[in-house]
Amino acid sequence: MNRGIWTCLVSLAMLASLAATALAETAGGPHREYPRDRARERSWRSGFEGRTYLRVHGGISLPSGDFSNAVNTGLGLGASLGYGIGRNTILSGGVAYHRFGEDFADGHVSVVPVTAAVDYGFSSGGRVRPWISGGLGLYHLSETVVVSPTVEATDRENDVGFNLGFGIALPTSGRNAWGVGFKYHHISGDTFPDTNFLTLQAGLSYPL
C-alpha cells in the first residue's frame, strides 16, 4: 500500500475520531448551561437561510493515484464566501491554493481552484452538525522545475475539475463555527492528465 493511501486512511481516522469525540461530548449527560450558551444554540439551529458567511480554512493536501507517484504530501489554504439559500443549504464561491513538492526533481506543483459549491448541513439534536459538499470550477495547475541556480522551467494549464466532501461543524460564539472536513478533488487536463488529490482541513466560519 503506497504512502498516499496510508495518509488518506490516517486522515479519515483522525476525522472520525474528532466526530466521535464531539458526539460523545454532546451526548455525555446533563451539564450546566448558561444563557449565552442557549442563545448560541438557538442561533446555530435556526439555519443558514438569508445569511452570508466568510469561511477560511487550511490543512494538508494528499496526492492520489498517479499524481502521488510524482509529488509529495503538501499544504493547502483557502477562503470562500457563502450565502444561505435554504435552512440547511449554502451556495458559495471560493479560491484556494495547494502546493506539492516533487519526488524526482527540484521543483513543485501548485493547484489553484476557483470553484462554486453547494454545502448541505444536516440538522441534529446536539451541537455537532455533519455536512456534505459538492463543487465545480476552474483549476489552475502549474509545475515549476529548477533547471539550474538561475533557470526555472514552468508548465501551466487551466482545467475544469470537481470536488466532493464531508465533515462536521461546531458553534463557537454567536453564529461563528469551526469545523474539520475531508474533500476529494478530480481534475482532467492535457499537460496534467487526471490529477487527483484529497484534502483534510480545519476552518472557521464568520457571519457577515
In which residue ranges do the predicted regions lie?
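Hydrophobic membrane-targeting alpha-helices
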Residues: 16-22, 121
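Extracellular loop and loop/strand-boundary signature of outer-membrane beta-barrel proteins
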Residues: 64-67, 102-106, 148-154, 187-191
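Short glycine/proline- and aromatic-enriched beta-strand/turn motifs that initiate or cap beta-hairpins
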Residues: 23-83, 199-207
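Bacterial N-terminal signal peptides that target proteins for export
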Residues: 1-10
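Extracellular carbohydrate recognition
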Residues: 195-197
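Bacterial N-terminal signal peptides
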Residues: 9-17
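Transmembrane beta-strand segments that form the barrel wall of outer-membrane beta-barrel proteins
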Residues: 54-66, 91-101, 136-138, 178-188
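Gram-negative (and chloroplast) outer-membrane scaffold detector with strong preference
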Residues: 44, 75, 80-149, 159-162, ...
